[in-house]
Amino acid sequence: MESIDSVRILVGTTTFSSKEDAVSAIDQLVRKNLAKCGQVDGPIESHYIWEGEKQVTLEWRVTLKFSHANKKNLETELKANHPYDIQQWVVWEAKAEVKYGSWVNSGPD
């Protein structure tokens, strides 16, 4: 199989208790040029233990694409404005198609 040229980007996910909060977070991070783009999906059903009790809640998942250069500032902004006491924040490096990855890693449009 032929390999596709790629560029490395970061992808991060977090969750919110309302679609409005999820959309607001993406809007804020994109407008500040900290994330290049984001998607909201949900509701999703989350199962977890909180304060010793099993919980099941509906949440909205936000997936963000951003550059290594913006990681620290994006995380600072997200943490400062996220409504949860403990935010889910999972980040991984991904290989993206060259044109898309270059766009994600570029400066403000």
Regions of interest found by a model, annotated:
Residues 1-109:
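Positively charged, small/polar-rich N-terminal and surface patches that mediate targeting and assembly
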